[in-house]
A protein has these predicted regions:
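Conserved nucleotide- and phosphate/pyrophosphate-binding catalytic cores
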Residues: 204-407
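NTP-dependent nucleotidyl-transfer catalytic core
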Residues: 1-193, 198-201, 208-213, 226, ...
Length: 407
């Protein structure tokens, strides 16, 4: 099976500008393509997973990836899919985030001469002359067409700033610049970027008289139509310091039965024939499918050694009801205690088991938190420092365990 057909079979392709030409290019390793990454955090997360896996598949087939970090456009903020305006970021923060991204991307694609490249659009956008830009580039855009774009519709009622209105021409200029200077003939992105991507292909056609192509990637949604990659404590990050390999493994191990085979098909590199054989699995077999999914994705992001540790810890915890050497652990210091005590809500947030005191309070009130096997009944409960002289085991829900020790 050729690459384009495999991408379709895995459910990865949403929209394309010209299916025949795109399939010809990527099947024969003739695509130099780019995917943009908005450096609004210091780590990639599960929401980026589809794009990273696609870049890896494309490079394996001989195509050349360009990872474009939006260091310039991040100074504006993409209005796509938002109902409010993004906060401004400093140049230093953006550069730090860019450096973090590249380190994580190296798990998926190979950078180097004649291989993948990473570029930062700040290198060309920050030096643009505004008068020349609106004359040479702005003249190629119809305001009427831009206002009909989906990415702007959602913002019109609450107010769309002129700053954000410039985002589409600037992203389109990225494609135009990469086409001219890097031979980039294709852009991939999420469904919410379709209008911006078409702006780029049209700009290239009008300015250079040449064809460029765009393809959107299917969004990773669960069976309820919600984006995957969120937990009670926030996003599922690829940085092990923000989401431990164990917690990353557990996220995929606990996906809904209705989502597991879709995730295996879209995200893993297992052969399609092997995945199709799982279509008839049910009951305990679906639990096995979840273990396969969790192991494969953890190995992809964190390496096989960490995946094996996480898998072993998960099995030990299930059998023993809580004791495992590789369990996520939080170490408390004197600074964490006030007058020799720490509140249970503060503890849950400190351990990453809740994103806020409000979230922690709901967990306790719902009967979802236990300490050393005893259910926590009072969200105002204070724990003395000597409570942690022996190991403290927190259980959240039925499947999440966390160990707390004194430093």
């Amino acid at each position: 099976m050729q690459l384009y057909d495999e991408l379709k079979a895995r459910g990865l392709i949403a929209q394309v500008t010209n299916e025949e030409e795109i399939s010809e290019m990527i099947n024969n390793g003739k695509a130099t393509f780019y995917i943009g990454f908005d450096p609004t955090a210091d780590s990639l997360h599960v929401g980026h997973f589809m794009a990273l896996c696609l870049m890896k598949r494309m490079q394996m087939a001989g195509n050349k990836p360009i990872a474009l970090i939006g260091g310039g456009t991040a100074m504006i903020g993409d209005p796509s899919g938002r109902t409010d305006m993004r906060s401004m970021m400093t140049v230093e923060t953006i550069q730090h985030n860019c450096d973090c991204f590249k380190k994580q991307m190296e798990r998926f694609i190979e950078f180097g001469e004649g291989k993948a490249q990473m570029v930062n659009n700040a290198d060309w956008l920050m030096n643009l002359n505004y008068i020349e830009f609106i004359r040479d580039i702005g003249s190629c855009f119809s305001v009427n067409n831009m206002l009909r774009a989906e990415c702007f519709k959602q913002r019109m009622e609450k107010g769309l700033s002129f700053l954000e209105f410039n985002y589409m021409p600037m992203q389109s200029y990225d494609f135009y610049y990469l086409f001219k200077h890097y031979g980039c003939n294709m852009q991939f992105g999420g469904n919410d970027q379709w209008s911006n991507m078409l702006g780029g292909t049209e700009l290239i056609r009008r300015k250079l008289g040449k064809d460029a192509h765009a393809m959107t990637i299917t969004l990773l949604l669960n069976s309820e139509g919600k984006k995957m990659g969120k937990t009670a404590s926030g996003a599922v990050w690829l940085d092990p310091n923000k989401t431990s390999p164990y917690d990353f493994y557990q996220y995929w191990r606990n996906v809904d039965d209705a989502d597991v085979l879709k995730c295996i098909r879209m995200l893993t590199f297992l052969p399609l024939e092997e995945i199709e054989a799982m279509d008839s699995w049910e009951g305990a077999q679906l639990n096995r499918a979840k273990e396969i999914l969790a192991y494969e994705l953890t190995a992809l992001v964190h390496g096989k050694e960490e995946a094996e540790k996480a898998q072993t810890a998960a099995k030990e915890i299930f059998v023993s009801g809580g004791a495992a050497a590789n369990m996520p652990t939080t170490t408390l210091t004197d600074a964490d205690f006030t007058d020799g005590q720490i509140g249970v809500l503060t503890l849950l947030v400190k351990c990453g088991l809740a994103s806020s005191n409000g979230e922690a309070r709901k967990l306790v009130q719902g009967g979802g938190v236990s300490l050393n096997g005893e259910k926590v009944a009072d969200f105002k409960q204070q724990l003395a420092k000597d409570f942690f002289n022996e190991e403290c085991m927190i259980k959240k829900g039925k499947k999440t365990f966390h160990k707390v020790v004194l430093g």
